[in-house]
Amino acid sequence: MTNVTGTERVKRGMAEMQKGGVIMDVVNAEQARIAEEAGAVAVMALERVPADIRAAGGVSRMADPTIVEEVMGAVSIPVMAKCRIGHLVEARVLESLGVDYIDESEVLTPADEVYHLNKRDYTVPFVCGCRDIGEAARRIAEGAAMLRTKGEPGTGNIVEAVRHMRQVNAEIRQVASLREDELMTYAKNTGAPYEVLLEIKRLGRLPVVNFAAGGVATPADAALMMQLGADGVFVGSGIFKSENPEKFARAIVEATTHYEDYELIASLSKGLGNAMKGIEISTLLPEQRMQERGW
């Protein structure tokens, strides 16, 4: 890779290319091929989908490099992989494997409860989760090229992704309405770096794409998140924990593209079989909420 490949402009541009698409979690080459054939713009290679990570408990780490390489060899679309928050070496290992993006992810057990990675030190672009403009701006300042809502992974429950997307967008509108001399106080109150807030105010949006993630389980869920302003959709457990992964994958891709065509979404939703089993958020203990990881 050349030095140009790792510049902020190129990293953000690579992420921008995924806009409007669906990124699917996969655990092997067969699932990766299903995702690609269904129209996914990228896949996320990991050992277990979030629902299985949640069910298993314990410590969840970076996937075995063999799985990542197997997925990379099976598809022509970009391949992402997750590292633990703050785990310098997992990130370097994934970079050495040649993945297209690294997700510093709260789905895995954090390695560092104080520091996130300085993503500017890496050639590969990073994806990070956020719940509000403070988290979004901090990750951007660290060098994230793509954001996504945290939602509540592995639950099949869209409510938290909706909450986070609405929160971020409401705060963007608030920042856009502030005078520049009011931004420093806003930065202090939210923990958002002042320079990033200035950029958000100037653009009227985040300077990087923001996808929906964490609870997307149906075509209607995907369309909902697009209508709320998502730039695209991550689907973790929703595809391969459903009754018919191939049908669900195609339907979610189509619904993401045609998110205002309600007749099409109705047609896509017919005869899909059962969606993944969902979890009511109020039944989760605080320590079971993955969205609380990171800051």
Swiss-Prot record:
PROSITE patterns from the UniProt entry: PDXS_SNZ_1, PDXS_SNZ_2
Keyword Lyase appears in the UniProt entry: yes
CDD domains, per the entry: pdxS (cd04727)
Record-level Gene Ontology MF annotations: pyridoxal 5'-phosphate synthase (glutamine hydrolysing) activity
Entry's transmembrane regions: none
Free-text function comment from the UniProt entry: Catalyzes the formation of pyridoxal 5'-phosphate from ribose 5-phosphate (RBP), glyceraldehyde 3-phosphate (G3P) and ammonia. The ammonia is provided by the PdxT subunit. Can also use ribulose 5-phosphate and dihydroxyacetone phosphate as substrates, resulting from enzyme-catalyzed isomerization of RBP and G3P, respectively.
Subunit structure and binding partners: In the presence of PdxT, forms a dodecamer of heterodimers.
Protein's name according to its UniProt entry: Pyridoxal 5'-phosphate synthase subunit PdxS
Native source organism of the sequence: Bacillus mycoides (strain KBAB4) (Bacillus weihenstephanensis)
